Amino acid sequence: MEGTFSMNGLIRRAVVAAISVVAMTGAIAAPANAGILTASAKDCGDESLSQPFAQFGDKAQYKLVQGADFEGSMDDWTLLGGAKVVAGNESWQVGGSSDNKSLVLPAGSSVITPASCVGLAEPTVRFFAKKNSGLLSTLAVSVYVKTSLGLVVPVPVGVVLGNGQWKANGPMLIVANLLPLLPGDRTPVAFQFTPLLGSWQIDDVYVDPFRYK
């Protein structure tokens, strides 16, 4: 687990620096050569897996990103621009009937998760989201990966649309699964959520580490 914790700090520092550049340029650039994103992690540790999206027809096994139910500690999260935990859970309470919190992302804010380990076989990220304001607002999702050269780089994952109600976002493919990792390798990644032209809430962020069928 030490590798995961050290990766948390490395990714967090690199991401904050990257966001400072983004704030000045107004855009997130994808790495010029995604083929060099080959760093793997051998010490990611075991995780507790569940099927939080089974009621939506998704029987895959997922693990909760550290703290991503927003019910406890937010250690190792990076909250920027007014992002904060608020009362109000996603409607299905997949994490438990006592869950009653989520993360609000005002316009101009952003959040970066702690590092989570994923494998080669089609890893995906899935979560709940709700648009609070902005007719044309969307929620941008990126993943930060450490390359074989030791660089932490952002790779866009996708954009979420909303209609003012909580919804279980469909599985989003993590670009890291296209990288030339060896079978059995695992690599730590961190996710960034950024609202565009409005305010959003997110809750219960899960990763499918091995894409179980």
Model-derived features: positions:
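Extracellular beta-strand-rich recognition modules
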Residues: 70, 123-131, 187-195
